[in-house]
Curated annotation (Swiss-Prot):
It comes from Rhodococcus opacus (strain B4). It is a peripheral membrane protein. This is ATP synthase subunit alpha. InterPro entries: ATP_synth_asu-like_sf (IPR023366), ATP_synth_asu_C (IPR000793), ATP_synth_asu_C_sf (IPR038376), ATP_synth_F1_a_nt-bd_dom (IPR033732), ATP_synth_F1_asu (IPR005294), ATPase_a/bsu_AS (IPR020003), ATPase_F1/V1/A1_a/bsu_N (IPR004100), ATPase_F1/V1/A1_a/bsu_N_sf (IPR036121). GO terms for molecular function: ADP binding; ATP binding; proton-transporting ATP synthase activity, rotational mechanism. It is found in: Cell membrane. Its EC number is 7.1.2.2. CDD domains: ATP-synt_F1_alpha_C (cd18113), ATP-synt_F1_alpha_N (cd18116), F1-ATPase_alpha_CD (cd01132). It catalyses: ATP + H2O + 4 H(+)(in) = ADP + phosphate + 5 H(+)(out). GO terms for cellular component: plasma membrane; proton-transporting ATP synthase complex. F-type ATPases have 2 components, CF(1) - the catalytic core - and CF(0) - the membrane proton channel. CF(1) has five subunits: alpha(3), beta(3), gamma(1), delta(1), epsilon(1). CF(0) has three main subunits: a(1), b(2) and c(9-12). The alpha and beta chains form an alternating ring which encloses part of the gamma chain. CF(1) is attached to CF(0) by a central stalk formed by the gamma and epsilon chains, while a peripheral stalk is formed by the delta and b chains. Belongs to the ATPase alpha/beta chains family. It holds the Pfam family ATP-synt_ab_C. Transmembrane segments: none annotated.
C-alpha cells in the first residue's frame, strides 16, 4: 500500500491561504424571554428595539404581534396554538410587520387570517404580499360614490341603495337574516362576473368572525351550489380560534380587497360580524392590562372599526377607478341600536339596513324596517330606471306602517285609508323574497312600477307573490322588447310603460286567485233586484208631436 506523504510546506501554505481569506463577522440578535402567558397573550421581557405591530417568533415557528410596548416588557398576541408557549422560552424579533399574500389565486379558497389555506385544496401560489395596517385612501384619491352595486334584494335596491365604494351597515338581532342578506348580495354578482368585463365584475370576500365552523361550511356550500365561489374568497376565524385571529380577520379580508381595488377592480367585502371582533379585541386589551372604558371596551375600540371601514372607497380615475364596498354586520340585543358598538359603527358607515325581529317573526323576510333604514348615498347609487319608479315607495310604506298601527285602535276608517292599507299590505308582500334568490334589476323595476300603477290592488294579498312570479315569466315572453330597453336599469319610457300595462291586463284575464276568482280590474255591473227596481223613481218625458 502506497504511503501518503504531505510536506510541511503544503500544510503551512494551506493554513496561510485559509487565514488570509477569513474575515471575522459578528451578528447581533435581540432575544427576549417569556415572563408569563395566558389565553393567547404573552408578556416578553427584553427586545428593547421591537416596533409596534412587529411580528415576533416564538419556539416552534409560532408568530405573535407586539401590541404593548412598555419600558421593560412587551405584551404580544399569539397567533396560533398558544398552549405550548411556556414561561422562560426564547422569543426573537423578525423585523417584519404583519402582512398577508394577495392575488387572484385566492378566489374560490378558504383561508385563515394569516392567508394560509384551510380548505384542504393545497397551497396558494402568490408572489405578492400586502401589509395589514395600511393608510386608507386620502380625500384627493377618491371620487364620489355614483355607481350602483345591485344586491338583488328589492327592498334594498329600491329604498336603501348601495353604491360601489360605500359602507352600508347591516344591523339587527341574532337570527333576523343578516348573513342571508349579505350572501344574496354576493350571489347577485354572478351575472356581472360572467360578462368577463372587469369594469362590471365584482370580486367578493366573506369574512367570518367568531362563527361556528358548521355555519361557515354552510355558507361555503350555499356559494358553491349557486356557482359563486369562483369569484369569492372566505376568510375564516371560527369561534374555536384564538382572540388574536378574530381580531385580525377583518384586516386580512380588507388587505386582499385593497390589492384588487388598487388594480382598478371592484370588490365587495362582508364582515360577519364586527361585534365579535370588538369582543375579541376587548378580551385582548383586558389581558394586556389596558384600562377599560364603557362596557369594558378599550378606549381605541372606535379606531379599531374606523380604520378598517375607511379603507372602503371609490378611487379616482387617475388611480384606476377601482372600488371597495363594505357590508359590516353588527348584532344588537333586543333591537337596541343605541348601544356602544352599534352607535360607533352607525356613525362610521354611510347608512344602515336595520333588520327587525318582530317583522322576521311575522314572516316579512327580509325583515327590513323601512323607517330607520337609510342610505346616505341615496339616489346617486341607483340606476335611472329604479330611481324613477321607487321614488314614492319608501313614503308609501312608512305611511302604511303608521296607518296600520293607528287602525288597530280605530273602529271605523274612511275609504281612502282602507285603500291605503290594502295597497300597503300588497307592497309588503311584494317586497318579500326567498333566501338565496336575488332578483335582476329589470324585474325589480317592472314589479315596482306595476305596483305603483295599482296592478296588484285587485290581487288577494295571499296571491301577490305567485301573481308576480307568473306575471314576470309571461312578460319575459310577451314584452321582451321592454326588457331590452331597460336592460342595465335604464329608465322606462311612456311607450314601454303602456305596453307593460297592456300585457299585464291581458295576463290578469287568465289569472285565477287561490279561491278560484278572477282578478281583473273592471268591476262587473251587478243586476238590480226586484225590490231595488220597485223603489226607483222613473221619470218619463213624453213628447207630443202635432200633425
Amino acid at each position: 500500500m502506497a504511503e501518503l506523504t504531505i510536506s510541511s510546506d503544503e500544510i503551512r501554505s494551506a493554513i496561510e491561504n485559509y487565514t488570509a481569506s477569513y474575515s471575522p463577522e459578528a451578528s447581533r440578535e435581540e432575544v427576549g424571554v417569556v415572563t408569563d402567558t395566558s389565553d393567547g397573550i404573552a408578556h416578553v421581557s427584553g427586545l428593547p428595539s421591537a416596533m409596534a405591530n412587529e411580528l415576533l417568533e416564538f419556539p416552534g415557528g409560532i408568530l405573535g404581534v407586539a401590541l404593548n410596548l412598555d419600558a421593560t416588557e412587551i405584551g404580544a398576541v399569539i397567533l396560533g396554538d398558544y398552549e405550548n408557549i411556556q414561561e422562560g422560552q426564547e422569543v426573537k424579533r423578525t423585523g417584519d410587520v404583519l402582512s398577508v399574500p394577495v392575488g387572484d389565486a385566492f378566489l374560490g379558497r378558504v383561508i385563515n387570517p394569516l392567508g394560509q389555506p384551510i380548505d384542504g385544496l393545497g397551497e396558494i401560489a402568490s408572489d405578492e404580499t400586502r401589509a395589514l395596517e395600511l393608510q386608507a385612501a386620502s380625500v384627493l384619491e377618491r371620487q364620489p360614490v355614483e355607481e350602483p352595486l345591485q344586491t338583488g334584494i328589492k327592498a334594498i335596491d329600491a329604498m336603501t341603495p348601495i353604491g360601489r365604494g360605500q359602507r352600508q351597515l347591516v344591523i339587527g338581532d341574532r337570527k333576523t337574516g343578516k348573513t342571508a342578506v349579505c350572501i344574496d348580495a354576493i350571489l347577485n354578482q354572478k351575472a356581472n362576473w360572467e360578462t368577463g368585463d372587469e369594469k362590471q365584475q365584482v370580486r367578493c370576500i366573506y369574512v367570518a368572525i367568531g362563527q361556528k365552523g358548521s355555519t361557515i361550511a354552510g355558507v361555503k356550500a350555499a356559494l358553491e351550489e349557486q356557482g359563486a365561489m369562483e369569484y369569492t374568497t372566505i376568510v375564516a376565524a371560527p369561534a374555536s380560534d384564538s382572540a388574536g385571529f378574530k381580531w385580525l380577520a377583518p384586516y386580512t379580508g380588507s388587505a386582499i380587497g385593497q390589492h384588487w381595488m388598487y388594480q382598478g377592480k371592484h370588490v365587495l367585502v362582508v364582515f360577519d360580524d364586527l361585534t365579535k371582533q370588538a369582543e375579541a379585541y376587548r378580551a385582548i386589551s383586558l389581558l394586556l392590562r389596558r384600562p377599560p372604558g364603557r362596557e369594558a371596551y378599550p378606549g381605541d375600540v372606535f379606531y379599531l372599526h374606523s380604520r378598517l371601514l375607511e379603507r372602503s372607497a371609490k378611487l379616482s380615475d387617475a388611480l384606476g377607478g377601482g372600488s371597495l364596498t363594505a357590508l359590516p354586520i353588527i348584532e344588537t340585543k333586543a333591537n337596541d341600536v343605541s348601544a356602544y358598538i352599534p352607535t360607533n359603527v352607525i356613525s362610521i358607515t354611510d347608512g344602515q339596513v336595520f333588520l327587525e325581529s318582530d317583522l322576521f317573526n311575522k314572516g316579512v323576510r327580509p325583515a327590513i324596517n323601512v323607517g330607520i333604514s337609510v342610505s346616505r348615498v341615496g339616489g346617486a347609487a341607483q340606476t335611472k330606471g329604479m330611481k324613477k319608479v321607487s321614488g314614492s315607495l319608501r313614503l308609501e310604506l312608512a305611511q302604511f306602517r303608521e296607518l296600520e298601527a293607528f287602525s288597530a285602535f280605530a273602529s271605523d276608517l274612511d275609504a281612502a285609508s282602507k285603500a291605503q292599507l290594502e295597497r300597503g299590505a300588497r307592497l309588503v308582500e311584494l317586497l318579500k323574497q326567498d333566501q338565496y334568490s336575488p332578483i335582476p334589476v329589470e324585474d325589480q323595476i317592472v314589479s315596482i312600477y306595476l305596483a305603483g300603477e295599482g296592478v296588484f290592488d285587485s290581487v288577494p294579498v295571499g296571491d301577490v307573490r305567485r301573481f308576480e312570479a307568473e306575471l314576470l315569466d309571461e312578460l319575459h315572453r310577451t314584452a321582451s322588447g321592454v326588457y331590452e330597453s331597460i336592460k342595465g336599469g335604464k329608465a322606462l319610457d311612456a311607450d314601454n310603460a303602456k305596453a307593460l300595462v297592456e300585457a299585464t291586463d291581458k295576463f290578469k284575464e287568465t289569472f285565477l286567485a287561490s279561491d278560484g276568482s278572477r282578478v281583473v280590474n273592471e268591476a262587473e255591473a251587478e243586476a238590480l233586484d226586484a225590490g231595488e227596481v220597485g223603489h226607483e223613481q222613473i221619470n218619463v218625458k213624453r213628447t207630443t208631436v202635432s200633425k
